[in-house]
């Protein structure tokens, strides 16, 4: 029971050490990834992993829950206070399970759901035909304007009036602009639909007051706690009090059994951190870094190579890069940046002619670098590295670019001393 991981399972310990090295020595720019504080790691690796706690605080189906009840209540209270919401359920194991619970609470199978098309930046759980949401519900989609790549609210209204959905989803996985939540709410009211906002990507910006909050406009709001919020990989549901009972029942027993109390403790820690000025500063640097990146990727040298920025810029933490006119496809560009030590993900762009495993775009995000401490100068440097690589393709001096990346990574050490604590047990 007391032997450290390195002694019990050196294979896994070795792989964890290698992954730690990868995170330290490269630049993480996948928009949905971040680095959690050590306090979050400690909470998630705590003895709460041993405790079963089906039900809600004060109404458990197991004994011995006197302490985990307090933990969950703290997490719920912090979530409500941070986002000024009437109620919160902190039990979803993931964003996808939170979304499944929302649909379970608001709809019955076969009813109509309207969301942003996956090909235009929507999420799998917003009605993609191979996902549970596309199999259980009658799904319609709105998209982006083919020229501006912006969501046209008049077109959304027209689609809603034609389709008459039970629920309208406002949210995205790869859309670089702020949504008009008031307009979505007005459309939902007009057609008698419920409005559900999935703010998984931009919740941290909302918490810091840098992005409009959907909470005053939506019936229900779901989010992940990682991404911009910088907490453990998990989900969270907020909303109006009138939906609390149906949401709670949809989570348990509708979607899950026992909650992961060690993860809920980690959520509580992350939500406390999200109310601090240090967190707000991090979000400001996240946002400014994305704008620096978008501006550099709109430069003449990049444009000459056929690379452009979808919608011409960004309002959030990510930039969507269009490679349709470039010699690179999404897979090739992802591999090229990986070779110089920058991790991104290939991503479809609107009207993408290539298959989803290849794509014609990249999704590039700034949260993890802001968490490491990057400011304007560093974001300008990494933006120039990416621009130079994409403009030059395989003809770029990749070794020189890799050296620049390595220097940036080593200037901002990550998880110093973590090996001794997490792997060796000292």
From Swiss-Prot:
Domain of life: Bacteria
GO molecular function, one term: glycine hydroxymethyltransferase activity
EC number: 2.1.2.1
Gene3D superfamilies given in the database record: Aspartate Aminotransferase, domain 1, Type I PLP-dependent aspartate aminotransferase-like (Major domain)
Entry keyword Amino-acid biosynthesis: yes
Entry-linked InterPro entries: PyrdxlP-dep_Trfase (IPR015424), PyrdxlP-dep_Trfase_major (IPR015421), PyrdxlP-dep_Trfase_small (IPR015422), Ser_HO-MeTrfase (IPR001085), Ser_HO-MeTrfase-like (IPR049943), Ser_HO-MeTrfase_PLP_BS (IPR019798), SHMT-like_dom (IPR039429)
Keywords, ordered alphabetically: Amino-acid biosynthesis, Cytoplasm, One-carbon metabolism, Pyridoxal phosphate, Transferase
PTM sites of type N6-(pyridoxal phosphate)lysine: 227
UniProt key word Transferase: yes
CDD domains assigned to the protein according to its UniProt record, in alphabetical order: SHMT (cd00378)
Top class in the EC scheme: transferase
Alphabetical list of Pfam families matching this protein: SHMT
Reactions listed under catalytic activity: (6R)-5,10-methylene-5,6,7,8-tetrahydrofolate + glycine + H2O = (6S)-5,6,7,8-tetrahydrofolate + L-serine
Physiological role: Catalyzes the reversible interconversion of serine and glycine with tetrahydrofolate (THF) serving as the one-carbon carrier. This reaction serves as the major source of one-carbon groups required for the biosynthesis of purines, thymidylate, methionine, and other important biomolecules. Also exhibits THF-independent aldolase activity toward beta-hydroxyamino acids, producing glycine and aldehydes, via a retro-aldol mechanism.
Family: Belongs to the SHMT family.
Cross-referenced NCBIfam families: PRK00011.1
Xref: PANTHER family: SERINE HYDROXYMETHYLTRANSFERASE, SERINE HYDROXYMETHYLTRANSFERASE 1
Subunit structure: Homodimer.
Name of the molecule in the record: Serine hydroxymethyltransferase
Organism: Mycolicibacterium paratuberculosis (strain ATCC BAA-968 / K-10) (Mycobacterium paratuberculosis)
């Amino acid at each position: 029971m007391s032997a450290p991981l390195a002694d019990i399972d050196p294979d896994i310990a070795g792989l964890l050490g290698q992954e730690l090295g990868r995170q330290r020595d490269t630049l993480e720019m996948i928009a949905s990834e971040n680095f959690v504080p050590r306090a979050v790691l400690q909470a998630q690796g705590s003895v709460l992993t041993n405790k079963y706690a089906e039900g809600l605080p004060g109404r458990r189906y197991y004994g011995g829950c006197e302490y985990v009840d307090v933990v969950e209540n703290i997490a719920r209270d912090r979530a409500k206070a941070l986002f000024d919401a009437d109620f919160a359920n902190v039990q979803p194991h993931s964003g996808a399970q939170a979304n499944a619970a929302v649909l379970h609470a608001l709809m019955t199978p076969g009813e109509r759901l309207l969301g942003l098309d996956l090909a235009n930046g929507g999420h799998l759980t917003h009605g993609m035909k191979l996902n549970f949401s596309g199999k259980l519900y009658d799904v319609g989609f709105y998209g982006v304007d083919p020229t501006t790549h912006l969501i046209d609210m008049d077109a959304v209204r027209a689609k809603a009036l034609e389709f008459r959905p039970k629920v309208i989803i406002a949210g995205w996985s790869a859309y670089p602009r702020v949504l008009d939540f008031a307009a979505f709410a007005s459309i939902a009211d007009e057609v008698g639909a419920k409005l559900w906002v999935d703010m998984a990507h931009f919740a941290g910006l909302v918490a810091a007051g840098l992005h409009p909050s959907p909470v005053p406009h939506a019936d229900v709001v779901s989010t992940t706690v990682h991404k911009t919020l910088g907490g453990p990989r998990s989900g969270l549901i907020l909303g109006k009090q009138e939906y609390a009972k149906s949401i709670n029942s949809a989570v348990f027993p509708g979607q899950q059994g026992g909650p992961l109390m060690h993860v809920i403790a980690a959520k509580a820690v992350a939500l406390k951190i999200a109310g601090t000025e240090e967190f707000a500063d991090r979000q400001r640097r996240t946002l400014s870094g994305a704008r620096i990146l978008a501006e550099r990727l709109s430069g003449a040298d990049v444009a000459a190579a056929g690379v452009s920025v979808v919608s011409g810029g960004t309002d959030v933490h990510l930039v969507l890069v269009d490679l349709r006119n470039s010699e690179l496809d999404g897979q090739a560009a992802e591999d090229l940046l990986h070779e110089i030590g920058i991790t991104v993900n290939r991503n479809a762009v609107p009207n993408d002619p290539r298959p989803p495993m290849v794509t014609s775009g990249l999704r590039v995000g700034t949260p993890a670098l802001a968490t490491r401490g990057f400011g304007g100068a560093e974001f300008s440097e990494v933006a120039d590295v990416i621009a130079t690589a994409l403009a030059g393709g395989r003809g770029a001096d990749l070794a020189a670019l890799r050296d620049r990346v390595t220097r940036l990574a080593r200037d901002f050490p990550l998880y110093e001393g973590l090996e001794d604590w997490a792997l060796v047990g000292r």
